[in-house]
Amino acid sequence: MPRPRRFRRILGEPRVVTFSPEASDEETGVEITLDEFEAIRLRDYHDIKQKKAAEIMGISQPTFHRTLTSARGKIAAALVEGRPIILKGGDYITDRRRYKCMDCQFEWISPEKEYKKCPDCGSENINVVSAETIPRFGRGGYGRGFGAGRGAPRVCKCIECGYEAPKTPGVPCRTEKCPKCGAPMCGAD
């Protein structure tokens, strides 16, 4: 039994879905799936390296390469044969809203809901982050995953005596006081 196809992440649907030659009498167009369109957009239009583009789409680099090669072949056939290009279909999910709290550094994705406050600490100091602009760390500019990979802290630590307590979800560590010395706590892992 073959493995199920993994959904590809696209950052938005194209504004135009059909490209047609001016004097085209050809009725059958070349269909390019939206995941193939996204591969072309990331690699050829934005000039993002294949490894990073594959991470953005949530697929492996070999799968990204196959998708890109397929799209380029279809576009070449349409140009040479004078056929229309139709963008539609494919196995994809949209990733329009990626959020990051600037106070507690918590990151989350929500394609349906628009957030005004951080679900972890309640801060209104949040930014919508594009997957293309997320900085990578480590040798060569690429790391494993987003940012430093820590996410929100799981432990609150006293800055004076070193006392540690489990973090309460939705309550920023900086609002907690150390039960031993009364000093403010901070997030730590």
Swiss-Prot record:
It holds the Pfam family DUF134. InterPro entries: RNA_pol_sigma_r3/r4-like, UPF0251, WH-like_DNA-bd_sf. It comes from the Archaea. Belongs to the UPF0251 family. PANTHER family: PTHR37478, UPF0251 PROTEIN TK0562 (PTHR37478:SF2). This is UPF0251 protein MTH_1178.
